[in-house]
Regions:
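Conserved AMP-binding/adenylation subdomain of ANL enzymes
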Residues: 1-72
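Conserved AMP-binding/adenylate-forming
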Residues: 28, 65-173
Length: 173
């Protein structure tokens, strides 16, 4: 079985990191802001040190630094998780590219409350950079646009997990 843990205080990087080290979750589900705060408070200060900046420019040594940062970040997330699932807003491209570069086990999904909530997802090993995955099982997804190359379209979803309507609220349905 699984347990769901909620913070009882407003999240700050310190409070989040403390909770993760105590709970040692198997799966972490978070909004991008939380992950970005952890990156800015834990990872970025290390990467901005002059010696580290130099090492990151040297082929081979850069990978040693990335592996060390990855290990430290995994331990900061409790050390026992399978992957971090990020969703609820756009993920910072700089942070996403860095996490991908160091092979950090994360994935970005897309969903909405009306779809209970996952629409797209992919295993972190298969996820493409700047993607939010593939359609979840038994979901059909399409983008409806008058001119797909020039006009942003509407995301349309069909599947068994899409709600039929809002409970006792026909006007909102």
């Amino acid at each position: 079985g699984c347990h769901v843990h909620f913070l009882s205080r407003l999240p700050s990087p310190k409070i989040i990191m403390q909770a993760l080290s105590e709970v040692k979750p198997k799966i972490v589900i978070a909004v991008p802001l939380v992950i970005e705060k952890i990156y800015k408070s834990k990872v970025k200060p290390v990467l901005e040190k002059e010696g580290i900046k130099f090492l990151m420019k040297v082929p081979g040594l850069d990978q040693i630094v990335l592996n060390k940062v990855r290990t430290e970040l995994i331990n900061a997330f409790g050390g026992e998780f399978i992957e971090v699932i990020i969703g609820g807003a756009a993920f910072n491209k700089e942070v996403e590219a860095f996490f991908k570069r160091m092979n950090f086990p994360f994935t970005v999904g897309y969903g909405m409350t009306e779809c209970a909530p996952i629409i797209t997802y992919d295993d972190w090993k298969d996820e493409k950079l700047y993607s939010c995955g593939k359609a979840a099982p038994n979901m059909e997804v399409r983008i409806d646009s008058s001119d797909p190359s020039k006009v942003p379209g509407e995301i349309q979803v069909k599947g068994a997990i899409v709600v039929l309507g809002y409970y006792k609220n026909g006007d909102a349905t």
